[in-house]
Amino acid sequence: MFARAVKPHDGIIMFRAFVYDNHINETNWKADRANAAVDFFKDLDGKFDENVVVQIKYGPIDFQVREPVSPLFSTLRNTSTAIELQVTQEYLGQQTHLVYLAPLWKEILDFDLKADDRPSKVKDIVSGERFRRPLGGSAGVVNVGTNSTWLGSHLAMSVGL
């Protein structure tokens, strides 16, 4: 609905794909929370308008310090996607430590999901190149506060730059 309304104005809709709980039974130790977004979105692949980009968190859980790359990147082959990167440091010492995130981002973007046993680096998927999609991109998530530095630290804003 929104995509069609903004299309005449060359508008793009970013649809955030964060699925926190897709009816997973927490008492079942074999339930796969990391696959919840795939379960939710796999049947929607190709059903979004061409001016919609599905924004996917780099990992399937929730910006944990170390987590695998989201399998949703290689699942949505007929839908334009963007990667959502963590800039905020809520899980990385609450901004009481200096954390340089560029190596983490590089590792994620260079990760090869090997879709169909072919090279499928995350950076090639979100650029639109791997699955020949017209759109793609990246987004950063920050927690902006009300103090003089906005992010709680004089260096926090420079971490992602």
Question: What do the predicted segments below correspond to?
Answer:
Residues 2-161:
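Substrate-binding groove of N-acetylhexosamine-processing glycoside hydrolases
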